């Protein structure tokens, strides 16, 4: 083999090595690019996932905030409605109290009412002797109906007429007015108690009004609610 042949073979080997190196370099470049694209895609997907999660989290926060605000507004509205109902009920009670106060101003009808209240109190207590308290202004009216009240009670229960002691030392408060605007008041009626004070029947007009009002209060509130709803 001469020098020309040797040189030719060497050149062929060099070309082969160079070609193989280029192919290998291309393979490495393609592989690296694929890995880069995969990593880039993974990073993009990871960021998208983070963004979606953050969006969902904020969306839930907004929804929760809306529910809280709605609940607060609803509660505030309910409180306003209840307050308005309470104001109406208070006004009704005040108006009824004024009407009750007018009852004692008609002496003829009030005198009969006092007798009925005394008889009713005696029937509740069923005591042979009782202590009666009334307003100072009503003292003469009470005294005028005592005997007829005792007789009516005795006839109803077929017993002896009871002893009724009218308290001349302690009277029920006077009716509401400017002189006792901030103190206790009584619109009329009587308080009857057993002699030992253990049993008490409060049969004042104010107490009767309070009992009636409490019984009617659910119905009153129901009507107020239906009016608001309408």
Curated annotation (Swiss-Prot):
Name the source's superkingdom: Eukaryota
Q: What does this protein do?
A: Subunit of the peripheral V1 complex of vacuolar ATPase essential for assembly or catalytic function. V-ATPase is responsible for acidifying a variety of intracellular compartments in eukaryotic cells.
* Record-stated family: Belongs to the V-ATPase E subunit family.
Question: Record's HAMAP family?
Answer: ATP_synth_E_arch
What name appears for this protein in its UniProt entry?
A: V-type proton ATPase subunit E
Q: Which GO terms describe its cellular component?
A: proton-transporting two-sector ATPase complex, catalytic domain
Q: Which GO terms describe its molecular function?
A: proton-transporting ATPase activity, rotational mechanism
Task: Could you list this entry's UniProt keywords, alphabetically sorted.
Answer: Hydrogen ion transport, Ion transport, Transport
Q: Does the keyword Cell inner membrane apply?
A: no
The entry describes its oligomerization and partners as: V-ATPase is a heteromultimeric enzyme composed of a peripheral catalytic V1 complex (components A to H) attached to an integral membrane V0 proton pore complex (components: a, c, c', c'' and d).
Q: Per the record's keyword annotation, is Transport included, yes or no? A: yes
């Amino acid at each position: 083999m001469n020098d020309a042949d040797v040189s030719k073979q060497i050149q062929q080997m060099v070309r082969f090595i160079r070609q193989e190196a280029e192919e290998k370099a291309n393979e490495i470049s393609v592989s690296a690019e694929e890995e880069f694209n995969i990593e880039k895609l993974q990073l993009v997907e990871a960021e998208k996932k983070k963004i979606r999660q953050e969006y969902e989290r904020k969306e839930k926060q907004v929804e929760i905030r809306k529910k809280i605000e709605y609940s607060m507004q609803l509660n505030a509205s309910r409180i306003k409605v209840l307050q308005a109902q309470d104001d109406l009920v208070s006004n009704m009670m005040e108006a009824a109290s004024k009407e009750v106060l007018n009852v004692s101003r008609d002496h003829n009808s009030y005198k009969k009412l006092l007798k009925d209240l005394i008889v009713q109190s005696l029937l509740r207590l069923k005591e042979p002797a009782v202590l009666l308290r009334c307003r100072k202004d009503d003292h003469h009216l009470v005294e005028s109906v005592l005997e007829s009240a005792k007789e009516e009670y005795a006839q109803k229960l077929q017993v002896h007429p009871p002893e009724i002691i009218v308290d001349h030392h302690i009277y029920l408060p006077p009716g509401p007015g400017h002189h006792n605007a901030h103190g206790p008041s009584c619109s009329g009626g009587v308080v009857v108690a057993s002699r030992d004070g253990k049993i008490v029947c409060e049969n004042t007009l104010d107490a009767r009004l309070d009992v009636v009002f409490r019984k009617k209060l659910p119905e009153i509130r129901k009507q107020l609610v239906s009016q608001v709803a309408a």
